[in-house]
Structure formats: C-alpha cells, structure tokens
Amino acid sequence: MKIRRAFICLPVIIILFFSLLGCRTEKKSEEVSSSARKYRIAVIPKGTTHEFWKAIQAGAIKASRELGVEVFWKGPQKEDDRAQQITVVEDFISRRVDGIVLAPLDDRALVRPVAEAMKEGIPVVIIDSNLQGDNYISFVATDNYKGGVMAAHRLAEILGGRGKIFLIRYLEGSASTTFREQGFLETITREYPEIELLVKDQYAGTTTESAYQLTENLLSRYPQVEGIFTPNESSTFGALRALQQHGLAGKVKLVGFDSSAKLIQALAKNEIHGLVLQDPMKMGYLGVKMVVDFLEGRPVEKRIDTGVVMATPDNMNQPGIKALLEPNISPYVR
C-alpha cells in the first residue's frame, strides 16, 4: 500500500519540481532582459559645424561604447536657431528617449522644453552652457567666468599692462560666452587701469564670416587697436582672418577661445598669443555618464567643472596642452 502511494505521489513531485524550476528560469530571464536593455540617450549640441562640437560628439560616443547605451546625435545647423533646437528637444521627448544631454543655445528659450522633458520623467543633463533655474539633474561645463579671467590676464601680460583693446562678444543669450566676456571685462576694468577698451558691446554672431566682417569694420574704425579678445572658436578665427587681411596678424595681440587646426597653426606662428582651452570630449563623455548614473540610481553631482587651461606659443607642445589642442576624436567621429 505504501509502495502504491509512493508511485502515485512521484509524478506529482516531478511536476511540482519542474513547475518551480520553470518559474525560476522565467524570473531569471526577465531579470537578464531588463538589465540588458539599452538606454536610449539624445545628445543635442548648439550646432554641428565647429570642431568643438565634434569633440563633444566623440566624448558622447566614447561613453556610449563603454557604458553600453545608444546615443542619438542631433542639433541645429546654426547656433542661433532657437526654434530648431527646441523642435529637436520636443522630438526626442515624443520619441520617449531615456535621457537627454543638452547644450542650450539660449539660456531662456530652452527652459520650457527642458521642464517638459523633466515632467515626462526624462532626465536632462545640461552641458557647455547653463540654463536659467536648476530644473535639470546636472550641469557639466567649463568654469567660463574663470576662462575669461585667464584671457584678461594673458592679454594684459603680453601688452605689458597697457594698451587699447577690443572685447568682441559672441551672441546674446549664450550663457557660456556671456560668462567668459563678463570674466574678461571685469578683470580688465578692475585690475588693469591702463588698458582702454575701445569696443566692448559688439557681437560677432555665430559664423566665422560674421566675425570676420565685424572685425574688419572695427579695424577700419580703430586702427590704433593693440589687442583683441574673442570668446569662442568662430569669433577667434574670424578675427584672425581680418588681422591677416590687414597685415596685422602677430602685431595686434589676439587671445581667443577653443581650438581648430587653423587656430593651432596661427598659435605656432605667433599670430595668436593665447587660446583658452576647454575639454569638450570630457564634457560629452560625462554628460552621457551622468544620465546613465541617474537612471541606475547612483548619486549625480549637480555641478561638474571640466577644467580650463591657457595654451600659448611657448607651452603648446606640452603633452597636457597638446591633448586639449588636438583631442583624439578619430576613433569616434570623422
């Protein structure tokens, strides 16, 4: 009788065993599927033409490969096209990406779309240029005010603490360059009373050509100028071209911001006397990483300073400076 009962119970035990095993296998499969899911992260620059943005893109792609996430890169053609950048942000919100990394080209105009993304549960990391308020998870950027201060000291140094200069601004509403201009202007005004600002309220615009045209006009109006500060890549190259056209490259001292092949050549020839360098690859990398950290529940710093240094004709071949002048973006972008 006992033997008969044992035979009756055995199939039941076997069925229960495999049922439990199946549940455990299914649960494990769900866990693997969840952890293996790729996050989809949009990276939205101010523009897509300057070398600076290519380095940002390279950093973002490097992070995507190391962290196993998918990155979408899309931005406006021109760095003053507020409407297009807003449309790009709204498009990624509608596509329900997992996170957004944004370099806002206007510190006011992008507040609303960023707030919309955050409300929809899409975390936003701001890079390069700040946004009004703090409705984002992290801000990853250069200390732009400090960069402007460094530029002021460098220009004053090569002018011997006296002379007549231009501050050529970039674009109204661009927070990053506004802070650079502010740092430069306040330092010159406060610390160098023998330096006269001939121009301080003229905007170069977003292209090399517009910067060239403005500098051309200013050189014609103020032939006595001895030094110029320009706060980004396009304004620096535009001013350089104008100085070259007038036969003044190297004679009028030029301190600029950011790097490109032509700016490096001019630095080596002493046609540019200083370039304030950021670390755009680091900016792009950390922008993506901060989104992933937030999604994974790890702590995220509200403000991350990616550093700033001054390149001169004398130090440009030092390894640390050279790496920022010519970041190795070729494994990531063409």
Regions of interest found by a model, annotated:
Residues 93, 101-118, 184, 204-266:
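Hydrophobic alpha-helical
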Residues 107-146, 157, 164, 170, ...:
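Flexible loop/hinge segments that line or gate small-molecule binding clefts
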Residues 24, 30-37, 175-176, 187-189, ...:
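Hinge/cleft segment of the Venus flytrap/periplasmic-binding protein
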Residues 40-59, 63, 67, 72-86, ...:
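Extracytoplasmic "Venus flytrap"
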Residues 1-40, 65, 93, 115-122, ...:
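Short, low-complexity disordered leader/linker segments with a strong preference
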